[in-house]
Amino acid sequence: MVFDYAKITRSRLMGSMGLIIRYEEDEKYIYQYFLLDGEGLGIADYVSLKNPTSKEACREEERLMGGLGESRVLVDEEIALFLINHFGNKNLEYGKDLPGDVDEYIKIITDYKSNLTLNQVYPIISKPIEDEVEFINYMTMSINIW
């Protein structure tokens, strides 16, 4: 498989991020959709589509990312794989089941090595808080979680 692109929502401050990776193999596309839970749960959802129509791919993207309310940014393969590894290891650490067809991504969790750190990736997956209203919304969400 050849990496085509990956994109993620900049919604880490709200707790969850949607990540999509698209690969190409034999002129067919494989989409992997991950819901990453930054509040300790790891990978919360996973779906893959093999050679979907454009409409099917868009529908799954909106199901995954539409409610997260933030912009989507392209990331390189190293960042995408780092995030899957990082959040997948949270599932293992907390004894939570990995979702979906685990065989499709388990090697990323068990075998992928990167020199990246979460501190390096954090500015990419988080939108800066730019005004008082955003700060109040963030604090309200944070307090309600506890």
What are these regions (language model features)?
Residues 1-146:
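Non-catalytic terminal/accessory regions
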